[in-house]
Every structure is written in C-alpha cells, then in structure tokens.
C-alpha cells in the first residue's frame, strides 16, 4: 500500500520550487513542503524535468532521497520516471537505479540540490 502511495501520489499537492537548470536545459525542482529532518538526516523529493523526451518517451524523473548534510552525501530511496512533465501521469518505478551506498555529489547538479536543501537558505526554493 505504501508503495502505491509513494509512486502514484499526485505532484499537484507538492510545492515544487526550481533549484537549477542544467547545461542540457533540464530543470531540477525540490518539493519544499515535504523536506523533513529526522535522525540527523534530511529527506526530500526532487524532480528532473527533461527539456526533450528521453528515448523511451519519459518527460520527467522523480526521486526520494536521504541526505547527510554533515558529510555532504545522499542515497536514493526511490526512483521513478514519468511520461508527463513535473512527475505527472503514471509513474514507472525503477528499483535498479537505487543506490545502496552513499554518493558524494561534489559540485554536480546533485551537489547544488543537496546544498540547497541542507542550507535552508533556499531563497530560490522557499517562499
């Protein structure tokens, strides 16, 4: 039941705030309403909205991540792809994309996202 809720919840109830646009033109958003801190970690949803459809027709991807702000690293807890922009339409979960180990993003787009979520300054994200 939880699985269905996670992957089929509507993005219309989220507060998606733009964080950064990549060199490819893809845009990255974080749901500012669902950022949570628990047990020394931060948990958040993010969407990558593709400028152009992927070869399989996906227009966006959505992930739920666990962040470690002290060590500047993250884990992917769930991952899905969508046939509509902004995580809309039917979600197709991709468990093989899950990373069991922590990943250090450095100065990549993932690093910009994690830094924004961890800093809580998020002038571009928070109201």
Say what each PLM segment does.
Residues 10-64, 68-127:
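N-terminal secretory-pathway/extracellular module detecting exported/lumenal segments
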Residues 1-6:
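Bacterial N-terminal signal peptides
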């Amino acid at each position: 039941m939880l699985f269905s809720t996670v992957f089929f919840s509507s993005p219309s109830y989220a507060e998606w705030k733009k964080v950064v646009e990549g060199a490819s033109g893809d845009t990255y958003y974080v749901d500012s309403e669902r950022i949570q801190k628990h047990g020394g970690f931060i948990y958040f949803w993010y969407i990558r909205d593709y400028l152009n459809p992927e070869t399989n027709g996906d227009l966006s991807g959505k992930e739920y991540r666990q962040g470690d702000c002290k060590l500047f690293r993250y884990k992917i807890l769930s991952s899905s792809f969508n046939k509509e922009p902004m995580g809309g339409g039917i979600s197709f979960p991709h468990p093989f994309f899950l990373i069991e180990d922590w990943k250090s993003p450095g100065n990549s787009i993932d690093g910009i996202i994690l830094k924004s979520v961890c800093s809580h300054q998020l002038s571009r994200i928070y109201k």
